[in-house]
C-alpha cells in the first residue's frame, strides 16, 4: 500500500495541442539561443513554458536580460554555446560571420536556423540562409526550422497560429531531435527533406497570398468593367441626352448597382469550370487525360473566387441598407409626394411593383444566407470536421441552390425591363441582362447532365470506365472456356 501512495498523482507528461501526451524528461534539457531580438525572446518564452532550460547568448547580456523570461539564463555567447547540444541561431544572415569565433565550441552541435531572407536577399544569393550557415560551420549539423512560425504564434501558442513547423536537414537524427522539441512546444513538425529544400521553405514567408492574386485581379477587372458600363447608362446618358446632372450617384448608387453584378458573375465562375470539366470528360470518354492547364488552375481557384463573390454580395447588402439614408433619396420621396398631391391622388399603390419588390428582396436574402453558409464551411477548421459527402453536399448542392436563388433574384429584379425600349440607354441593354447569360448557360448544362443518358455515362467515366478501353483477360490454359473480354 505504501508503494502505491509513493507514486505521484500527476506524471511528468505534457498534453500536446492535439490531445496526445508527450513525455518530458526528468531533467529539463538545455537549449541555447544565439540572438536577442523579438523572435529570440518569443522562442525563449515558449521553450521555458514547455519545460526546457534556456540559455541565451547575447553580446550585451546586462542590457537584454530584462527582456527575457526570468527562468531563462542570459549570458555571453561563449558561455551560452558551451553546454547545450541544440542551439537556435536567431540572427540575420549578415551577422552569421560574427559567430565564426565560436566555431570550435559549436563543433558537433545541432544549429537550428530560424532566419528568413528578404526578397532582395533571396534574389542576390544562390544559397539559402541555412546552406550558407552550414558552409560557415562544416563541423555542425544545420537544421532549418521554425522560420514559418511568427513571433506572435510562439508566444500565444499553436492554438492562435499555424501549428505546422517545416523542418529540413541532411541528418535524420538531428531532424528527429528538432521534431521532438517542436512537439513538446505544441507544434506539428513536417519533414520537408534535405537541407537543399531550405531555399523553398525560406520562400514561403515571402509569399503574399499567391492563390488570391488571379481571383482578386479577376474581381477587380469585373468591377471596373461593370462600373464603367453602369456609369455610362446611369450618369453619362442622362447628362448628354437630358442635361441632368446625376454625378452624385457615382460614390454609392452606381457602386451598389455594380456590386451584385460582380458577385453574381463570380459565383457563376465558381461552377462553370465543373461544367466544362464534365463536358470534356464526356467528349474524351475517359477521366485519365489531364485537363488543360488553364482549366486546372481555374478549378484550383474556385474557393477564392467563391469567397470574393460572398464579399461583394455582403457589400451589396450593406450598401443597400445605406440607400434610404441618402439625402437624394429623401428629396425623391418629397418630390414624389408633391407630384401625388398635384395629381390629386390620395393613394399610390401598384400591386405588381409591390409583389415584385417583396419577392426579389426575399430571394436576395435567401441567396445571401446560402452564400454565408458556403463561406463558413470553407474555413479549414470547419471543413476538416466534415466528411467528404457532407462537404460535397454543402459546396456543390447548396452552392448550386445559391446560384439558382441568385438567378431568380435577378430575374424578379429585372421583371419586364429587358423588353422595354426606354431601358436601352445608348442602345445598351440593362446590366442585369448581361449577368444572366453565364448563369443560365450553367443551369441549362447542369440540367442536361442530370438526364439519365448523360448522368450514367458521366458516373461510369468517373469510376474508371473508358469508352475505348477494352481489356482482354486470358483464363488459364486448362480452363474449358476460351478468351474473355471485359470493358474497364
From Swiss-Prot:
Principal subcellular localisation of the protein: membrane
EC annotation from Swiss-Prot or TrEMBL: 1.16.1.-
Subcellular compartments: Endosome membrane
Vesicular side: 229-258, 326-358, 412-433
List of residues binding NADP(+): 36-39, 58-59, 91-98, 116, 151
Binding residues annotated for heme b, in chain numbering: 316, 409
Protein name according to UniProt: Metalloreductase STEAP3
